[in-house]
Each structure stands twice: as C-alpha cells, then as structure tokens.
Amino acid sequence: MKEFDYIVIGGGCAGLSLAYELEINEKLKDKTLAIIEPRTEYKKDKTWSFWKVANHNFEDCVKKSWKNFTINIPKKTNHLECVCYPYQSVDSGLFYEKINNKLKENKNISFFIDISEINFKNSFVFNSVPSIKKDHLNLWQHFCGVEIETQNNFFDDGIFNLMDFDCDQRESVHFFYTLPYSKTKALVETTWLSKMNDNSQNDYDGQIKDYIENHLNLKNYKITYKEEGAIPLFYPTYELSLIHI
C-alpha cells in the first residue's frame, strides 16, 4: 500500500482547512498528503457563521456579513453593534469548491474513502474526527434551520437576530436565530441547549413553521434548503487508535 508523509483524517471544515493552508504555504512541494473522507462528492451541507476576529482566506465564500444584531426576550428587543467584529456566514458549498479546486492542482495530494487503503505507520497523522460518545444525557446544542425565500421584500438584511428567546422553553434553553441574506432570503433556525432525551424538542419542522408563520407573521414563502446538527457542550472522550497523531 502507498505511503504518505501526511495524512488528514476527515475532509470536513477542519481537515480541508489544514490541507489548504499546507498547500498555499508551499509545505507540500516535496511532501505527499492523503485526505481520508468517506463522501464521494461535496455539496452544500452546512452554514458556518462566526464573529470575524481576524483576517481569513475565505472572504470569497462569505455569503453575508452584518454589523448589527438583535437579541430578544419576551416584550423586549436589544439592539447591538458588532462593527469591530462583524458576523459572517460562510456557504459550505463555496468553501468546499474553493479548497478542492486548489488541492486538485497538486498531484501530491490524494483522497481516499478509508484509511485501510493506505499505509499510515510512517506518516504524520492529523485526526479531525475525534471519537465522541453520543450520550444523550449530556448537554448538547442541537438545531435545525431552513433557508426560505419570499416573493416580496420582507427582511431587513442590514441586521440579524442572534437569539430570540420569546418562544416555548420547555424547561430547557431554546431560541430562534434568523440570518437575512437579502430582503427576500433568510436562514431561520431553531436551537436548543439541552440533553437530547426529550423527543418533544425534536419537532424541528413544526417549531420552525410555527415561528415563521405566527411569530414573523410570514405566510407566503418557500423552503429552499434545510440543515440540522448537534454540537456537544461537554468535554469529549478521545480514543486514540493510531500512532503519530
């Protein structure tokens, strides 16, 4: 089996970012890199949003930036500015396309579906897929979001809603999150900070529909994209099974 100088396990945001930085900083001119990723094609599957606290190489993948936001509690809305650290939203589809197009230029970089296809014993391995036990009794941030489009102008795309707590809490922490990409397009997301043992919280579609139609008072819209996920809010247990990681 073929050997590589470097191996990146996981071709998601972290793994591809590392490979991209190695490539653009000319660290792979005389080195080989293998990326282990089970997917056979890349397409938009996530929206990554963050406060821009430093310059980065993916401004051309930013879908929208905001310098103003709101936080809502029942009967009160707080307006805040984030001029020094604007909030940015990156389209994962554009991110994947940019990085993969760059990596394809270097014949020293190869993709594999499984690590069993290569010899890793003498390689320097970066593992971006830690083993996390999916314990539903621990605290998680679990969410579901939809991108919607309206026929007429509806959203103020100069300001986003970071957290709207004016919703059913169900003895947990629950808020909605709205990113207006334009006056007719927005991401609306329901987010819970809770254990994942209450199935009643997982009615994401119903929660979002009720929020859009009865809270935002928007009746005519279409859903163009959907995403969901769960982020552990506890210290994970790592199980190292490979050497040189």
Per-segment meaning from a language model:
Residues F4-A34:
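N-terminal Rossmann-like FAD-binding beta1-loop-alpha1 element of flavoenzymes
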Residues Y20, I24, N101, P180:
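Short, well-ordered alpha-helices that flank and scaffold nucleotide-derived cofactor binding pockets
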Residues E21-I24, A34-P74:
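N-terminal FAD cofactor-binding segment of flavoenzymes
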Residues S65-K134, Q141:
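Conserved N-terminal helical subregion
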Residues I109-L216:
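Predominantly flavin-linked oxidoreductase catalytic cores and closely associated redox partners
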Residues N217-S241:
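Flavin (FAD/FMN) cofactor-binding core of flavoprotein oxidoreductases
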Residues I243-I245:
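Conserved small/polar residues in nucleotide/adenosyl-binding loops
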